[in-house]
Amino acid sequence: MALAIQLRQPSRAQPLPGLSHTLAGTDSCDVCNSTNLPEVEIISLLEEQLPHYKLRADTIYGYDHDDWLHTPLISPDANIDLTTEQIEETLKYFLLCAERVGQMTKTYNDIDAVTRLLEEKERDLELAARIGQSLLKKNKTLTERNELLEEQVEHIREEVSQLRHELSMKDELLQFYTSAAEESEPESVCSTPLKRNESSSSVQNYFHLDSLQKKLKDLEEENVVLRSEACQLKTETITYEEKEQQLVNDCVKELRDANVQIASISEELAKKTEDAARQQEEITHLLSQIVDLQKKAKSCAVENEELVQHLGAAKDAQRQLTAELRELEDKYAECMEMLHEAQEELKNLRNKTMPTSRRYHSLGLFPMDSLAAEIEGTMRKELQLEELESPDITHQKRVFETVRNVNQVVKQRSLTPSPMNIPGSNQSSAMNSLLSSCVSTPRSSFYGSDVSNVVLDNKTNSILLETEAADLGNEDHNKKPGTPGTPGSHDLETALRRLSLRRENYLSERRFFEEEQERKLRELAEKGELHSGSLTPTESIMSLGTHSRFSEFTGFSGMSFSSRSYLPEKLQIVKPLEGSATLHHWQQLAQPHLGGILDPRPGVVTKGFRTLDVDLDEVYCLNDFEEDDTGDHISLAGLATSTPIQHPETSAHHPGKCMSQTNSTFTFTTCRILHPSDELTRVTPSLNSAPAPACSSTSHLKSTPVATPCTPRRLSLAESFTNVRESTTTMSTSLGLVWLLKERGISAAVYDPQSWDRAGRGSLLHSYTPRMAVIPSTPPNSPMQTPSASPPSFEFKCTSPPYNNFLASKPASSILREVREKRPVRSSESQTDVSVSNLNLVDKVRRFGVARVVNSGRARIPTLTEEQGPLLCGPTGPAQALVPGGLVPEGLPLGCPSGIRRNRSFPTMVGSSVQMRAPVILTSGILMGAKLPKQTSLR
């Protein structure tokens, strides 16, 4: 109780330095124990509605006045050393504090009592805390000590167990010694048996020395044995060491050898590695090459397959073309036969239709497309209107029927596409020419023996198209230029069928025509007007390409002259004259179309066009070698006058010259009429490129072009196709037009080419000199050609009397030759069919002062077979024998000036006088072979 009283005594602890409590009230009620104390916010316990305060007092320091409890009541530095009894009693006192709750309730309204109770509670709590701290400290100390003691006890237990084990071991050892001692002294043991527990110590003491001595002896003996064993082991060890050393030396030696081998092997390995690397590179390179070669092989295989396919296709195409070619050759032969028959029929019809008493020269050397030819024809027609003809009505009906059939044939002609059938290209297709070749018009009559040589110019084509215009109707309006028919059509079969009908009609009337022809020939012979050989009573003096009793298919196949505007009835039937045909043709050419896109234009260069690498300035003469000639010359002397000369090799065919290409044009269409008193004219040609090889059909006679460079007529069907666009120089002359213009006081320039001297000076064979440089048939790219330094110009020299120039036809030349030589001409010297009674050229010649020479001898008709060419005879000697398609160099009677490069355009020379009254001498001229070779291609 004394302790409790002591604790309850209020003891005011002094506040520590810096300690202060502050009470701050939210209602501005400040309760302070000093002026500088902090404010404290408290909650009043007297009333429930009092404002709340926040305590801002520092609990570490107490207060210095009695209004507040000064804490802590016990200094932290005070050491409370209480005994266990004190602590126990104090705790009991604390447990009795619950009894004071009622006291506090009773004194609730007494502030002082409550304060004192709170102070007591504070002191009790603080004291209890101090007691608890001291107890915890003591408990911790005791716990640590207890753990330490437990560890020590564990160690002690281990030591005790070890000691016990050692003690047991020693006890067993002692028992062992004791048992051994008992065995050594059995008597003593037996006499005086001792218990174990009692005699153990004495036995140890008794036997200790003996056992030790015995053990010492045993140890010494054992030591000696061990020493001997050690010596033996040492000796063995030395032996083993020596062996080991020897073994080591051997190993070192082997190792050294192995190192040397390893070094050498390493070097070899390095070399092998390098070789392997190099070989690997080579293998890689070879593999790449193999891959490339495989790719190339695949590409080559693919290409090979393609080429094989192309080759197969080419072979199939070749076989097909060969079969088509055979068919075309068969059709060609059939068409040729029908063509010859149609030509003969047409000629006979013309003979029957028109009387032979007043036939004028229809065509001079004017081309079909020239205005001069139309002027001449118009004038002649006006003159003919004065003397009307009265032909037989039956013959007119036959003519009308023939023309009607021909129009049907023209309408059904084939439109097979051909590179020549291009509108505006001045050409027509071969098939078009084939089926329209038999059309007889006043302006164009074509006779020929070889349809492969057929090419129609645009003039003739326009006439044929106008002829069929009435029959075709609106069909022509749907056709566009340059749009031919499709291949394989039945046009050819239809045309052949119609031609076969015409052939039957012809065969039925042929006999009548032949009888009528013989009757006329007899009448002419009786009158003494027949002076030449094979006479054909037609208006064509050169139409020898017929089968007749007098000329068995002579070499002049296709050299037919036609009457242009002399036949008004036929003109009304075939072509109604609507203005100028030439102007109409020019109007067609002026219409824009793509037909002539491949034709060259002067001053216009086609994009991508390349000319041939040939010398354009080279000029070829007739005496040059052909590339296929053997160099043999046919002797011009010693030939019989009327003996046919056979040439077995005249049918030689050279397909390498069958191609041609038009690159230059020499079309001299002019109205200048050749007059003896005019000036000379010089014409210089201009070439775009060299012509392609022309077809050549000769192998013996050199310098014989296939087609005439300059012919005084329109080329026939057979001749004009020999070269697709034959080179000709169109220089027109007309005897009739000259006379008509002269009567009206019109004169023109003089063309006096040296080669036109057809009159000759004496014997033509004896006066032959190689002065002419005419154009050979060999193309410029031929290896047998003779180049010239510069391109010659058209230079005409007057080497003959002036009246030679306008007499450009063959009969006129013969007449002049007769006049100059003043001697008659044998009847065998003429191979042309001339109806003397129908010629009025002599009347015109008389007006120029030329006497008429009449030979009343009978005409001797030479016979020619198909394998023989025609025979030309000069006045005094044998004529020159010509191969098919050739022309003799002498005289060049058909008007090719010296040095003229061949014209690549088609317009040809139109025949001169058709009916003449004088015999004709054909000493040197254009002769077509009896049989033209078959061409392998229509191109």
Curated annotation (Swiss-Prot):
The family database entries (Pfam families) matched by this protein are listed as: HAP1_N (PF04849), Milton (PF12448)
Q: Which UniProt keywords apply?
A: Coiled coil, Cytoplasm, Endosome, Glycoprotein, Membrane, Mitochondrion, Nucleus, Phosphoprotein
For this chain, the Swiss-Prot or TrEMBL PTM comment says: O-glycosylated. Glycosylated by OGT; glycosylation in response to increased extracellular glucose levels is required for and leads to regulation of mitochondrial motility by OGT.
- What range(s) does the HAP1 N-terminal domain occupy? 46-353
* Positions of post-translational Phosphoserine modification: 534, 716, 905
Q: Does the record bear Repressor in its keywords?
A: no
Region annotated Disordered, chain positions: 472-492
Tissue distribution is:
Widely expressed with the greatest expression in brain, liver and kidney. Detected throughout the CNS, including the cortex, hippocamps, thalamus and various subcortical nuclei of the forebrain and midbrain, the granule of Purkinje layers of the cerebellum and the gray matter of the spinal cord. High level detected in lower moter neurons (at protein level).
Outline the segment boundaries, as ranges, of region: Interaction with HGS: 359-509
- Region called Interaction with OGT, residue ranges: 655-669
Q: Which residues form a coiled coil?
A: 106-354, 490-524
At the top level, the lineage of the source is Eukaryota
- One GO cellular component term: cell cortex
Q: Which residues are glycosylated?
A: 444, 677, 716
- GO MF term set: GABA receptor binding
Name its cellular compartments: Cytoplasm; Nucleus; Mitochondrion; Early endosome
Subunit info? Interacts with RHOT1 and RHOT2. Found in a complex with KIF5B, OGT, RHOT1 and RHOT2. Interacts with HGS. Interacts with GABRA1. Interacts with KIF5C. Interacts with OGT; stable interaction is not required for glycosylation of this protein by OGT. Isoform 1 interacts with OGT.
Similarity section: Belongs to the milton family.
Q: What does this protein do?
A: Involved in the regulation of endosome-to-lysosome trafficking, including endocytic trafficking of EGF-EGFR complexes and GABA-A receptors. Involved in mitochondrial motility. When O-glycosylated, abolishes mitochondrial motility. Crucial for recruiting OGT to the mitochondrial surface of neuronal processes. TRAK1 and RHOT form an essential protein complex that links KIF5 to mitochondria for light chain-independent, anterograde transport of mitochondria.
Task: Quote the disease note of the record.
Answer: A spontaneous mutation (hyrt mice) causes a recessively transmitted form of hypertonia neurological dysfunction characterized by postural abnormalities, jerky movements and tremormutant. Hyrt mice have much lower levels of GABA(A) receptors in the CNS, particularly the lower motor neurons, than do wild-type mice, indicating that the hypertonicity of the mutants is likely to be caused by deficits in GABA-mediated motor neuron inhibition.
Q: What is the name listed in the Swiss-Prot or TrEMBL entry for this protein?
A: Trafficking kinesin-binding protein 1
Q: What is the originating organism of this protein?
A: Mus musculus (Mouse)
**Gene that codes for this?**
Trak1
